[in-house]
């Protein structure tokens, strides 16, 4: 499976490393010039990052027996200053000649990324390269660690690389995390965002969704065979982590690790059109008007209760498809394409177990999010802090279970 993926779907850097030819000119680093075998690989994309921050991060991994694949990149349409700063970063990183880092240049002229593919392509380049090195025997572990330049790695971060999965389809693992900042307002914004995301994931879990997990690229580890099976990272300028895990969930487990927790610097960023950076910007703007944070809104709990009803209705349909869905739920699921899905499946000979799997593959993480957002038309958003303070005990316990903010 891995060989087939690398041959047919991998990016050029990985195919070159896996072949008999010399490494392409945009790859550099001492590990390319020796034969050391590492415990595992860690992939970090970097665009318009400060050298000091990245140097500190890379240095912290020096004794971990981890080969870091650093993909220094810039989209073709980035502003000239960001491109110039990223190229200067590339120059400074090259000067260090780290013994444990391979640098991929996707920031120089002729090498920059398609803006529509952005960070998704950057992650894919790095992970494809890690996969090729694993196949070539340069790494022992099947786990591919992924992170970002704003993460502080705790002691024990690389311990996962020493574990042996029970099955080849081991899926993905999610590290717990919390956002922090030396700026009090930004720190509080990071806390609110972590609470919002933990509340959302807990709501999915309460509803019985199998897509109840965080989707943050800097906190993911993917098993090599699983990564190949889903054909790697989607080439997207944002949301690549969400879509990768959405694909993995249909094939293998996505599990949250008990620890260690990653500390992620809360940063207002315009690198991507949506995600953590833009969300933090909106929260900071909100805090300027209401420093208490009470006016920061999140989903109404009844959205998740309605999701639970929908999932139970789909389970009943899988057992007895001759009994059609009815009422408001049918309308909401039809708006997501359920009628076409059910009609297509009805033309096949299927068992209840097969229908159950198919319907939950169809009603995936993306459709779940779309369903929750559609519920906002009847259950308006409300204060996150007030919601968390007034949740029933079981729901509050579940939020605590998924809580990423350690204070």
Show which residues each predicted segment covers.
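Terminal low-complexity segments of carbohydrate-biosynthetic enzymes
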Residues: 1-3, 282-407
């Amino acid at each position: 499976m891995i060989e087939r993926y690398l041959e047919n779907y991998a990016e050029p850097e990985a195919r070159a490393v896996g072949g008999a030819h010399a490494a392409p000119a945009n790859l550099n680093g001492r590990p390319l010039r020796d034969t050391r075998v590492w415990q595992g690989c860690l992939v970090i994309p970097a665009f318009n990052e400060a050298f000091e921050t990245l140097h500190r991060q890379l240095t912290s991994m020096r004794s971990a027996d981890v080969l870091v694949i650093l993909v220094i990149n810039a989209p073709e349409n980035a502003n000239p200053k960001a491109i110039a700063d990223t190229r200067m970063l590339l120059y400074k990183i090259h000067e260090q000649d780290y013994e444990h880092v391979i640098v991929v240049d996707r920031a120089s002229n002729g090498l920059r990324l398609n803006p529509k593919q952005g960070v998704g392509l950057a992650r894919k380049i790095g992970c494809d390269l890690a996969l090729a090195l694993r196949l070539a025997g340069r790494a022992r572990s099947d786990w591919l660690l992924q992170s970002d330049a704003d993460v502080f790695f705790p002691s024990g971060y690389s311990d996962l690389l020493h574990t042996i999965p029970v099955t080849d389809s081991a899926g993905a693992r999610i590290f717990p995390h919390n956002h922090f900042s030396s700026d009090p307002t930004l720190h509080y914004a990071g806390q609110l965002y972590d609470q919002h995301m933990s509340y959302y994931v807990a709501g999915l879990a309460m509803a019985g969704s199998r897509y109840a997990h965080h989707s943050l690229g800097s906190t993911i580890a993917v098993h090599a065979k699983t990564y190949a099976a889903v054909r790697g990272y989607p080439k997207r300028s944002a949301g690549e982590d969400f879509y990768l895990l959405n694909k993995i969930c249909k094939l293998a487990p996505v599990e949250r690790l008990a620890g260690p927790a990653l500390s992620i610097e809360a940063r207002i960023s315009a690198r991507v059109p949506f995600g953590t950076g833009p969300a933090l910007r909106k929260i900071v703007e909100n805090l300027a008007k209401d420093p208490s944070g009470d006016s920061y809104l999140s989903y109404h709990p009844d959205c998740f209760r309605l999701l639970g009803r929908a999932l139970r209705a789909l389970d009943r349909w899988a057992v007895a498809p001759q009994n059609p869905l009815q009422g408001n739920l049918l309308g909401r699921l039809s708006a997501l394409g359920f009628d076409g899905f059910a009609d297509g499946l009805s033309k096949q000979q299927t068992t209840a177990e097969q229908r159950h799997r198919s319907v939950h593959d169809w009603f995936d993480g993306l459709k779940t999010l779309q369903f929750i957002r559609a519920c906002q038309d009847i259950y308006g958003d409300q204060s996150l802090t007030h919601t968390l303070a007034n949740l029933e005990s079981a729901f509050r316990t579940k939020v605590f279970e998924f809580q990423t903010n350690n204070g």
